[in-house]
């Protein structure tokens, strides 16, 4: 899978994780919370994207 992702600092990643946890404690499902925070991050980081590639074949080999 290849996708454009904003480059986040460790502090920004921590804030995102805390925001997800807050939304979940308010009754939102984990998937909904992650999607909402991802949308918020994308909206606030226009033009600061890096390309990230995930090689799923390596994951399959490591689990065997």
UniProtKB/Swiss-Prot annotation:
Belongs to the UPF0181 family. Coiled coil: none annotated. It comes from the Bacteria. This is UPF0181 protein NT01EI_1861. Pfam families: UPF0181.
């Amino acid at each position: 899978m290849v996708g454009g992702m904003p480059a986040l600092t460790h502090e920004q990643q921590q804030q995102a994780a805390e925001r997800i946890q807050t939304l979940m404690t308010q009754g939102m499902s984990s998937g909904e919370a992650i999607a909402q925070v991802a949308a918020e991050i994308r909206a606030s980081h226009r033009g600061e994207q890096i390309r990230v590639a995930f090689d799923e074949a390596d994951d399959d080999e490591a689990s065997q």
